Amino acid sequence: MSQEIRAIVRIGDTDLDGNKQVAYALAKIRGIGIASAYAICWKLGIDPHAILGALPEDQINKLDWAVRNLHELAPAWFLNRRKDPETGRDLHLIGSELVLAAKRDVDLMKKLKSWKGVRHSLGLKVRGQRTVTTGRFGATAGVTKKKAAAGK
């Protein structure tokens, strides 16, 4: 009795490898890591070591719902966007929403001309790292060898 395994499973607007274990396949979604994937599986009662492509359709639909609505399942400290500046709600963003939110945050810092925004706009390091010797940009000055002595 061989079970059909789907090669590609679509969860959270991301194509996942159906031949991988559920937890490791879910971790390929941007915004979901291994810890989040195991937490989702535990919350739904799905074996995290089962093969994703072998799961029945109803469990895949449950996984998709849980990935999109993790803010309803998990406590606030587990989410990746607590107290969203626009809505004030605790959210867990995935995929392109996460990338766009980070870009909006940087653009807001630039617009407000905060210290971090100024550093971002100048292309410098933002988090207090040293910049004297590292983080240089532009062409590198190569080192040239002297010509070998002719008589030797």
From Swiss-Prot:
- Annotated signal sequence is none
**PROSITE patterns (alphabetical):** RIBOSOMAL_S13_1, RIBOSOMAL_S13_2
Q: Tell me which GO cellular component terms the UniProt record holds.
A: cytosol; small ribosomal subunit
Q: Which Pfam families match?
A: Ribosomal_S13
Keywords from the named record: Ribonucleoprotein, Ribosomal protein, RNA-binding, rRNA-binding
Give the residue spans that cross the bilayer. none
Q: GO MF terms on file?
A: rRNA binding; structural constituent of ribosome
- Family matches, as InterPro entries: Rbsml_uS13_C, Ribosomal_uS13, Ribosomal_uS13-like_H2TH, Ribosomal_uS13_archaeal, Ribosomal_uS13_CS
One Gene Ontology term from the biological process aspect of the record: translation
What job does the chain carry out? Located at the top of the head of the 30S subunit, it contacts several helices of the 16S rRNA. In the 70S ribosome it contacts the 23S rRNA (bridge B1a) and protein L5 of the 50S subunit (bridge B1b), connecting the 2 subunits; these bridges are implicated in subunit movement.
> PANTHER family, from UniProt?
30S RIBOSOMAL PROTEIN S13/40S RIBOSOMAL PROTEIN S18, SMALL RIBOSOMAL SUBUNIT PROTEIN US13
The protein's matches in NCBIfam families, at most eight in alphabetical order, are given as: PRK04053.1, uS13_arch
The record's subunit annotation is:
Part of the 30S ribosomal subunit. Forms a loose heterodimer with protein S19. Forms two bridges to the 50S subunit in the 70S ribosome.
Q: Which family does it belong to?
A: Belongs to the universal ribosomal protein uS13 family.
Name listed for the protein in its UniProt record: Small ribosomal subunit protein uS13
* Lineage summary: Archaea, Thermoproteota, Thermoprotei, Thermoproteales, Thermoproteaceae
Tell me the gene name. rps13
